[in-house]
Amino acid sequence: MFEWGRAICYSGYRQEQSPKTATYPTYEQIKEDLTLLNELGFKYLRMYDPIRYAEETCKVIRDCGFDMQLMLGPGLISEVNNPGCPWNKTNYSEEELKQRAERNDRNIDELIRIANENSDVINSVSVGNENTPQWGENNVPIERLISFARRLKEGTGKPVTFNEGVYEWEHLKQLADELDIISIHSYPLW
């Protein structure tokens, strides 16, 4: 499916920049980062949040002629309350959970748009990232993840993956059956 190459998760935020405040790296900052990664031989990048930052990253790759491709995923937020999350005990109302699900739907739509407009750079799309663990802050029901996988496959024609820790995959067979690639996080210590 893909030629072998070095891969890295890319997030080029500088001090005072954050997706939470909608302050993103500039074109020149992204170019600086990708020039370094290109010199180090990285061919594949993984990013989340289908926003201007991802589009700008695609533009830099294209403008500079870097031999790089991007796996882009949505920045999903929780659609269920998770009392098992040790650092976020927020108890969202039904209305808030509905709004969060609508935001995730918009994120998937935006991901499809960006993947199609940058099909020369984006080689695969992800349903999400760590959205099922018992300790997770941004959990999404498996049925919704499956529907996202189907929408992404139909909407982009790109290989579809989901990024999750090694221990969660034993509970994700239904989702795995919908995917083209299984992306496993294997932390050395946790």
Residue locations for each model-derived region?
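Acidic-and-aromatic substrate-binding clefts and catalytic sites of carbohydrate-active enzymes
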Residues: 44-56, 77-81, 101-104, 133-134, ...
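A structural motif
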Residues: 39-42, 122, 157, 179
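Catalytic domains of carbohydrate-active enzymes, especially glycoside hydrolases
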Residues: 28-53
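Boundary/entry segment of secreted carbohydrate-active catalytic domains
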Residues: 1-33
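Hydrophobic faces of well-ordered beta-strands that scaffold small-molecule active sites
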Residues: 4-10, 45-47, 68-74, 123-127, ...
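Aromatic- and acid-rich polysaccharide-binding/catalytic face
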Residues: 72-74, 83, 123, 129, ...
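Substrate-binding cleft of extracellular glycoside hydrolase catalytic domains
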Residues: 57-158
